[in-house]
Amino acid sequence: MASGVTVNDEVIKVFNEMKVRKSSTPEEIKKRKKAVLFCLSPDKKEIIVEETKQILVGDIGEAVPDPYRTFVNLLPLDDCRYGLYDATYETKESKKEDLVFIFWAPDNAPLKSKMIYASSKDAIKKKFTGIKHEWQVNGLDDIKDRCTLADKLGGNVVVSLEGVPLK
């Protein structure tokens, strides 16, 4: 069921910037987004970038020691969101980076919000061409353990996520 919600051009721009890894200067790399959340506009007619809910590659280290944990902490406990997370992980063979589309619909979000976000999900997914991994998350228990994301990325072949070895 389509909701009639549109996707703001800035959302598509952010996705394309995260998807395309062109050779960049160190300064440009620091400004690249590692993770970003998208929400519905106040009038519920458009999916927009949630400007204050993002992690830049340049922040990783001192300001953001663990980007995965920081991303989880950006998620609101009482409302839905869409997210893009640029996962850096290692398999037994090689290092990899993949974008993960996350539909966050916590159990205690208002029913109306869950319905609008669920029915608008296809609108944003259609704009995110080439995404290999999609994950619907319904609560912190589903997302707080990085092993769950590792399973989505490649099951038992993933040995570390964001430089942290998996147990």
UniProtKB/Swiss-Prot annotation:
Entry's Gene Ontology molecular function annotations: actin filament binding
Subcellular location as annotated: Nucleus matrix; Cytoplasm, Cytoskeleton
Highest taxon, organism lineage: Eukaryota
Keyword Coiled coil listed: no
Keywords on record: Actin-binding, Cytoplasm, Cytoskeleton, Nucleus
One of the record's GO cellular component terms: actin cytoskeleton
SUPFAM superfamilies noted in UniProt: Actin depolymerizing proteins (SSF55753)
Cited Pfam families: Cofilin_ADF (PF00241)
Position of sequence motif Nuclear localization signal: 30-34
Domain ADF-H: 4-153
Gene Ontology biological process: actin filament depolymerization
Annotated InterPro entries: ADF-H, ADF-H/Gelsolin-like_dom_sf, ADF/Cofilin
Function of the molecule: Controls reversibly actin polymerization and depolymerization in a pH-sensitive manner. It has the ability to bind G- and F-actin in a 1:1 ratio of cofilin to actin. It is the major component of intranuclear and cytoplasmic actin rods.
The family this protein is said to belong to: Belongs to the actin-binding proteins ADF family.
Protein name, entry field: Cofilin-2
Organism: Xenopus tropicalis
Lineage: Eukaryota, Metazoa, Chordata, Craniata, Vertebrata
Name of the coding gene: cfl2
